[in-house]
């Protein structure tokens, strides 16, 4: 069962096809095979992408873009298609990796600001040149979370300071071109999943 994957759907790009990126390391395909409605792209003998064509035959997807926290119903539909094609299935996602945090400290650092962010059960550190007020709720990702098929966050050392979180902007989520941290204005629990919050609204 595949644990690490990222879904993408856009009628403008793939014309009624659901894209499932299976490997975090972006590589160019060297082989393609077809299994009924599923096109599989391979690199070095390993599947790197599933493309389910004619997805509207099976289910209706209303959103456009990356699906960071797919519903169990959608995964069940996808897995039914994959099983019929004789392919490995997807695990349910328990969370998206996009977490709501509360800024508890801000310190000028180098040319920007170092932030301490409370995620309920842990404190993480993020760096940006953007000034954000203490006590604001923001959206961050931690190590290993994918933004798209080519970009994912890894912890790094910034002149002696460990940076283990990254502020998410509207631009990161293709909501707008605004490259500023998303501020959560409505009531939201610190440590909760941003996309679960969106789904519950």
Regions found by a protein language model. Name each.
Residues 1-201:
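Phosphate-backbone binding interfaces of nucleic-acid-interacting proteins
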